[in-house]
C-alpha cells in the first residue's frame, strides 16, 4: 500500500475544528468510533490513522479516515495523537513519539488502566502534553466493524491529568487514601467538577481535550490514576473476568447441546465473554494489584453461598443487597 493515502470527497464543514490534524493509532472499536465521529464533526480536519494494512483499507472503504499509514511517520504534523491500541502497546508507543511527531501535540490514550502509562508518559519531551484517557463506551465485541460515530453519546470519558494530584490534594486532602472503599471513590470522582474546571482554566491543552471529548458526545470527568485503577477493577475488570469464567464453567459442564437449552439469563450474564483476550491480558497485567482484591471479594461471596445452600439465610442477605445495588445501577 502506498503511504499515506488521502481519502477524497469531504462534505462542507459543520463546526470549527478543535484539532486540525487528528492522529489515531489503532482502529479498533474505540479508535474507529473516534475516527468516524471526528470525520463527521470536523470535515476540514484531517483524520490520520495508523494500523495494519487490512484494517486501514477497510477504514478507507468505510470513509472513516482521511490519511492511512502503517508507520508513525504520518503523525509528523498531528496536533493530537490518540493511542487506541492495547494497553502495553500504547505504553511502548510513547517511546516512539519523539522521533515521529515533530510539533507540539496533545497526547492521550484510551486504555482501561492508567498508572503505568501515565508514569511512562512523564519521560515525554515537554512539547507534548499527555493526559491519560479512558472512554467508558466499550462493547462486548471489538474491532473496526463494530465502530460507530455515536458510541460515546452520553458516556463518561475519564481523564487523569498529571497535574490533578496537586489540585485534588488542595481541594480534598483525603481523596487519595489508598484504602478508601469503592463507594467512597465513586463519591470522590463525582465531586471532581470544580477541580476539573480549575485545571481546564490553567491548562489550554486540557481545555481543548475537554472540548474535543464533549463534541464527541461524551462527558469528561477527571480523577487520579490511583482512583481510576481501583474503581475500574470493580466496575469493569471484575465483571469481565467473572463473565469469562462463568461461561467456561457452564460450557465445560453442559457442552454445545446443553447451551441450546439456556434462556436469556445466561446470555445476558455472559455477554462480556466475547471480549478479545489480547486486550484483557494487558489490562490484567497492568492492574493486577487492584483486580486481585476484587476477585478475592467475589470469591468470598461465592464461598458464603456455597456454605449456605441448605440454610439460605446468607443467600437471602446477598440477594437482598444485590437487588438494592442493582436498582441504583446507571443504565
Where are these regions (language model features)?
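Rossmann-like NAD(P)(H) cofactor-binding subdomain of soluble oxidoreductases
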Residues: 95-145
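Rossmann-like NAD(P)-binding element
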Residues: 71-108
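Interdomain hinge/lid region at the active-site interface
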Residues: 255-323
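Residues at the starts of beta-strands that form the adenosine-phosphate
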Residues: 21, 46, 129, 156, ...
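Internal alpha-helical scaffold of NAD(P)-dependent oxidoreductase catalytic cores
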Residues: 152-177, 183-184, 190-271
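NAD(P)+-binding Rossmann beta1-loop-alpha1 motif at the extreme N-terminus of oxidoreductases
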Residues: 2-72
Amino acid at each position: 500500500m502506498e503511504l499515506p493515502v488521502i481519502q477524497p470527497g469531504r462534505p462542507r464543514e459543520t463546526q470549527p475544528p478543535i484539532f486540525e490534524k487528528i492522529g489515531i493509532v489503532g482502529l479498533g472499536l474505540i479508535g474507529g468510533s473516534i475516527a468516524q465521529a471526528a470525520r463527521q464533526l470536523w470535515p476540514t480536519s484531517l483524520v490520520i490513522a495508523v494500523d495494519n494494512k487490512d484494517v486501514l483499507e477497510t477504514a478507507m472503504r468505510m470513509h472513516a479516515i482521511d490519511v492511512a499509514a502503517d508507520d508513525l511517520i504520518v503523525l509528523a504534523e498531528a496536533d493530537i495523537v490518540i493511542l487506541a491500541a492495547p494497553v502495553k502497546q500504547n505504553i511502548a508507543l510513547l517511546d516512539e513519539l519523539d522521533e515521529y511527531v515533530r510539533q507540539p501535540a496533545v497526547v492521550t490514550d484510551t486504555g482501561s488502566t492508567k498508572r503505568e502509562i501515565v508514569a511512562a508518559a512523564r519521560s515525554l519531551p515537554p512539547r507534548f502534553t499527555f493526559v491519560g484517557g479512558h472512554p467508558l463506551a466499550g462493547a462486548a465485541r471489538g474491532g473496526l466493524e463494530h465502530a460507530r460515530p455515536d458510541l460515546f453519546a452520553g458516556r463518561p470519558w475519564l481523564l487523569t491529568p498529571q497535574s490533578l494530584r496537586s489540585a485534588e490534594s488542595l481541594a480534598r486532602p483525603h481523596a487519595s487514601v489508598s484504602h478508601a472503599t469503592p463507594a467512597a471513590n465513586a463519591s470522590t470522582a463525582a465531586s471532581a467538577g470544580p477541580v476539573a474546571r480549575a485545571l481546564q482554566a490553567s491548562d489550554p491543552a486540557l481545555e481543548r481535550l475537554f472540548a474535543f471529548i464533549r463534541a464527541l458526545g461524551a462527558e469528561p470527568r477527571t480523577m487520579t490514576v490511583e482512583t481510576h485503577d481501583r474503581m475500574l477493577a470493580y466496575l469493569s475488570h471484575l465483571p469481565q473476568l467473572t463473565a469469562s469464567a462463568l461461561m467456561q464453567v457452564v460450557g465445560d459442564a453442559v457442552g454445545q447441546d446443553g447451551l441450546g437449552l439456556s434462556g436469556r439469563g445466561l446470555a445476558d450474564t455472559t455477554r462480556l465473554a466475547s471480549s478479545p483476550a489480547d486486550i484483557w491480558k494487558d489490562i490484567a497485567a497492568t492492574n493486577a494489584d487492584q483486580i486481585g482484591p476484587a476477585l478475592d471479594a467475589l470469591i468470598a461471596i461465592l464461598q458464603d453461598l456455597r456454605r449456605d445452600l441448605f440454610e439460605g439465610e446468607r443467600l437471602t442477605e446477598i440477594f437482598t443487597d444485590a437487588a438494592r445495588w442493582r436498582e441504583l445501577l446507571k443504565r
